[in-house]
């Protein structure tokens, strides 16, 4: 019951998220990825509060000035580059609810590299992605509401994730024309990625970060792709993917 009180699911846009009011962040963001969502609008930089969530629960990291304290970037969970078909779609990725305090080198390095790898696996069928953050034991904290070295009087403590993850699912052929629910287990492929939140990764992506969806479910306690057969979620075959 307590978890239900502090968490809320947002479904009324082109992605779905589970937002945690105490963490001031989404624990996961789920979204379809297809060419219909990508175009030439580019980054709107439309940093704003999420209109579907009370502002007191959101990190104050919106507007042109407000950021997290010190070395933390405003890290997207659904990437801006995954929603460039229209300015409206792109602007929704800049809501504060989609941000977490992310180390700048991690954000612009290994995480950006992984985001690019995910896009390389787009196909005629839809690619399904869930991006999330995990707060392990001993997580640190930062503050929101900073502009330069100055803090807003209403600045809040914001937990910093210890890990980030992605799980992805698509048809093997990429052009089956079938919904996932119409596919047998031999027609689907899935994989996950689990990264410790630190700043000393090499710039290039490595398959050592690959895990099964089942592994990430065990780490986080969440169930992803609930209608998909278990044998698909046990897969961890990097050679099946463009990585």
Each predicted region: which residue ranges?
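Generic preference for hydrophobic
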Residues: 8-9, 30, 129
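Domain-level detector of nuclease and nuclease-like folds
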Residues: 57-243
């Amino acid at each position: 019951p307590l978890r239900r009180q502090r968490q809320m699911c947002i479904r009324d846009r082109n992605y779905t998220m589970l937002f945690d009011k105490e963490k001031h962040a989404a624990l996961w963001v789920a979204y379809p990825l297809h060419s219909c969502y990508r175009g030439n609008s580019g980054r709107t930089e439309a940093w704003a509060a999420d209109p579907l969530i009370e502002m007191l629960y959101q990190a104050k990291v919106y507007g042109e000035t407000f950021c997290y304290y010190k070395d933390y970037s405003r890290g997207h969970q659904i990437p801006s580059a995954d929603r460039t078909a229209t300015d409206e779609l792109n602007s929704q990725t800049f809501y504060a609810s989609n941000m977490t305090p992310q180390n700048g080198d991690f954000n612009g390095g290994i995480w950006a590299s992984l985001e690019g790898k995910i896009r390389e696996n787009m196909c005629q069928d839809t690619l399904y992605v869930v991006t999330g953050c995990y707060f392990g034991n001993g997580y640190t904290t930062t503050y929101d509401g900073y502009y330069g070295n100055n803090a807003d009087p209403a600045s809040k403590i914001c937990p910093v994730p210890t890990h980030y993850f992605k799980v992805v699912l698509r048809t093997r052929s990429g052009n089956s024309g079938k919904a996932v629910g119409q596919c047998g287990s031999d027609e689907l492929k899935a994989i996950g990625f689990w990264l410790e939140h630190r700043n000393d990764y090499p710039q290039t992506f490595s398959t050592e970060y690959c895990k099964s969806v089942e592994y990430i479910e065990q780490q986080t306690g969440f169930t992803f792709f609930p209608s998909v057969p278990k044998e698909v979620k046990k897969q961890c075959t990097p050679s099946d993917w463009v990585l």
